[in-house]
Amino acid sequence: MNIFSSWASSRSTMLRFIALSLSYTLSLFIFQKGLLVKRHVLPLKSSCSDIVSEENCWIKPKYNKSIFLIIDALRFDFIFPYENCMGKQQLKGDEKYYHGQMPKIARLLREQPGNALLFPFISDAPTTTFQRIKALVTGSVPAFIEAGDNFDGTKISEDNILDQLLASGKNATLLGDETWLQLLPDRFHRHFEKPSFDIMDLDTVDDAVIASIFDEIDRSDWSLIIAHCLGVDHAGHRYGQAHAEMSRKLLQMDKLVEELTQKMDEETILFVFGDHGMTSTGDHGGDSLNELSTALFAYTRPNGNESAKPFSAEFDCSGKFWCGVDSVSQVDLVPTLSLLLDLPIPYPNIGQIIKPIFGNDSSNLFQQLKLNAFQMFRYAREYAKHQIDLRDDLSKISRLYESTTNTDDLTQTIKNLSNLIRSSLDQFYFELCLVGIFSLVDSLAFNCFLIFNAKNTTPFFLWIFRSAMLLLQLSLIFAEKPGNDQLIYTTTSLFVSLCYFLLVFLFGSSIKIKFKYFISFLFSNFQFFGQLILGFLAFSNSFIIYESDVLRFSIQSLILIALIKQLNIHREFSIYRLSFNFKMFIFHIIVVFPSLLILKQFESCREEQVLCYTFIFTSEQLLPWSILASFVSTFFLLEDRWKALKITRFFVWPLLILLYLHWIFESMVMTMKGKPSTSQSVHNTINLFENLSQLLAKSIFSVTLVHFFAIKLFGDENLNKINWLKSIYQMISLPLIMLIGAEYGWRTAFCLFLFPVADFFFQNDIKNWCWLMSLLAAYCFYATGNQRTLNSIPWRAAFVVLPGNFAFKWVPASFILTAMFFGQLLASLMAHMKEEETAPFYLILFLAMKVLGSVLASLLHHKHLMFYKVFAPKFVFDAVELLTCCAFNFIIYLLTTSF
């Protein structure tokens, strides 16, 4: 025990930090498991025996085959036939790249009105590919938290249309996106898949689809072809909607649709649709109208019988231009295809058949709606066994259903039932949420204990107790449904822990408080109360939407407090009598305030923000400014603020040249692709420049890694921890700028020099210094174009260095997290440069206080209309930011253990 105490007293800082990080991690996972619950999956499946039918499975099929052509991110206005509805007119500005680029589909709608239909196809948030595929095959609505499965999707186990197809003795063929195989393995008779994660590659997947689909149509042993093209989506991610590459991909898809309509036979129905839309910058994941709205184009070949058109509606530009019906939900495709091919509707489906596709036979349509309602009521009754609140409303709708005698009433009944099931899917585990909050408060208390007790040895019994408590918390996370005993044991342990910390806080020798000095204590620790107030402002959705403004105001206010303290010291206001230190103080304020103002002008806007305009510039337009800013920032870090080591200077300046070459080649690729060309030499040149650009990016990262080792091998004999960390800060600045991109490079450069400048304030006040660093780190997230929304995730960062088909997904994921939360990395490096070993713990404490506010706000507003749009993303991003900051600090501890 003495040996352990001796070891703990000398080398315990990193161990303490690991214990603290684990405590925060488990607390957040417990709360997330209670708040963002995955939908309960029923293992039941539909079958032909569910319905009594003499010759068929459920109903007589209308078609024998179907083709799904999925054009990823096909927004509705991309396919809308403007020429049909508005005549030939000049498109305004950048609209020429994405409007009116599918004229062949417009011609089919105009010339074959009874055989071609177009609907707005509305998806459910989150608009990520995994969730959309799941909805398209099961007819269900995935939960918000399942957006994380987009990186490592789990297999779909519940009933789906592909399983029904196989059970009926039919088969399916897959072409294109390999995600389908990951989610639905062993479902396809033949598959010709390509990797889907490389957003820099616009053509590989699409070309593979085009090369195989016509040969597949010629075969006679298929019933469903799923062809998933990714070029439009990747063009959006890489270039945005207003680019010649977007026009090229839309025209290519338009031509493919025309060729399919000519190749298919009369027994086949073609569905062309998108899985989601995109924003003007090509992003998706959220629930804005542009992200949710995609298109569904349905087509059958004319059969020569003009009196019996296959569809009961025609495309109409006036009024309800979507064929006389309301917009179609994405889940509606599942029951529609099932009954068209005479397949049992998958058990978890909550979609409604698309009536115009079934023709004009009202009696047959009523029967199809009855089958749709039967399946949905069956699912709702089974689901109600697990969701008691559903039962009363279900009984009311069931009574209305029994008295329904016409298609309109039956349609409304199905719609009401679908809405009821959707609302019941939004559930949470309140007891687990409370344990998660209790755990987070305990982690905060543990954090405070480690700060105020930093100079003393942590008692051995406390390590034993916290280890046991961590095991209890782990049991809650891994249990499918935690039992009452687990909850009681964990809560009791947390209560005992909090009581211990409270007693230590009140009576411990190092942090003893006299109540008569309580007011003085509050003022001396105002930064903690200030951060708590900032955290609790998350109860207001307006604060979340305008959080960047609040952070910027807080930074400026804190610096003004530092100025007031300086003025209190320098009461003599003569400019000639002021100390050099005070003049430098004023100079640093003059640098920081305008920098924050400039960064504010270029922040990205959220959909909910009013009077906000996002300045959209191409990377080519911003390249000169990024080059200039990166040079100034590098010079400032190397030659002015911190005198760089010779070996660091030897590495950084050549690295800056490599960065410029990388940007130049990247810019040339963007420019050349913006000008349509069919010349093979041009395409070869583009490929060469792309390869050179990525090779330079790899070289920059490789040289940075070499520097980490070289500085220890060949560095100064007097190299210490602080100098080494300064060299790391100087060295990683250029890879960070490159990772975030030329478009945001100049903003990243601003942030890089703001931290050393802000270091001048509160040099002898560790608490205020850490609070300022924490606020600045949080603001850098917004300064580089990010928002607390899924569609603002910088996917591009994953592909700057690595190819899209890189085997280990955690590596590109780490690049994305670094690009988003690089401010926390910089703040962590700055904290480890301080003499105070508590600085990293203060940094984590301030960040965790903000997370506490997000946690409480998300629980309180769980039923709020804006929960999934504002409060849930806020909690997720704040939690990930805290865990990422813990990871950054852990890595720094590992790298500095030898000092």
Identify what each model region corresponds to.
Residues 13-43, 47-54, 58, 62-68, ...:
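Active-site-proximal alpha/beta segments of enzymes that process anionic O-linked groups
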Residues 1-9:
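Short, low-complexity, Lys/Arg-enriched N-terminal segments of secretory-pathway carbohydrate enzymes
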Residues 74, 141, 230, 277, ...:
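Solvent-exposed coil/turn segments that connect beta secondary-structure elements
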Residues 8, 15-35, 425-899:
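Alpha-helical transmembrane segments of integral membrane proteins
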Residues 92, 148-152, 247, 281-284, ...:
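Active-site rim elements
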Residues 286-295, 300-304, 313-323, 330, ...:
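Active-site neighborhoods of enzymes that stabilize oxyanions during catalysis
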Residues 68, 75-76, 241, 248-290, ...:
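Metal-dependent active-site segment of extracytoplasmic phospho-/sulfohydrolases and closely related
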Residues 353-443, 468-474, 532-536:
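Phosphate/adenylate-binding glycine loop and adjacent helical scaffold
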